[in-house]
Amino acid sequence: MCIRDSLNTHHHYDHVGGNLELKRKYNSKVIGFKEDKKRIPGIDILVEDNQIWNEDNFEAKIYHVPGHTSGHIAFHFFKEKKLFIGDTLFSLGCGRIFEGTNEEMFNSLNKIKKIPDDTEIYCGHEYTLQNSKFCLTHDSTNLNLKNKILEIERKLKNGLPTMPTFLKDELKCNIFLKAKDVESFSKLRDLKDNF
């Protein structure tokens, strides 16, 4: 096995803690947001918002999606229809606001909503079942959500991963993506922080 690139969505240790070991063991290149260069260990390649990053046969559009952290980015492999989103968006949820503001996170989620809805979403953590309980509490009549929860439970029962998810499913079921304005998003985020 050879790991050539380490794609860093943000500087939190659970996402960048292995960078130096990957560089040492595989001579991997560390890619991250230029504004976070002092917080991402071993960074080699600096990327910025709306840049197309190329590596051999792969191309990814970089999206700056602040909210969880100020320097959070996403890698959109648009030809393959895959989005590596880190901790900005989770299946049926979104990341906590640590450095950013509710408005920044709301705007970042709106940016994601403009990506083609047949895109696969790869997030940084698996909180799907817990997130589903919160969504159901606040959107109890949503049949799409109820069906997604049944699918999640079936997958977990059979030892299958619930990820990736598709953006089209998240648009129908994820209450954070359905929030109409910053105020309603902020209320949901505050409720989720204490759920």
Where are these regions (language model features)?
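Accessory terminal helices/loops
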Residues: 110-120, 129-195
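Glycine-rich, phosphate-binding/catalytic loops in enzymes
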Residues: 23-25, 101-102, 139-140
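Active-site HxH/HxHxD metal-binding segment of metal-dependent hydrolases
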Residues: 4-61, 151-155
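Short hydrophobic/aromatic-enriched beta-strand-loop microsegments
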Residues: 27-34, 84-86, 142-147
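Catalytic core of the metallo-beta-lactamase
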Residues: 4, 40-136, 193
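Residue-level signal for inorganic ion chemistry
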Residues: 10, 22, 87, 125, ...
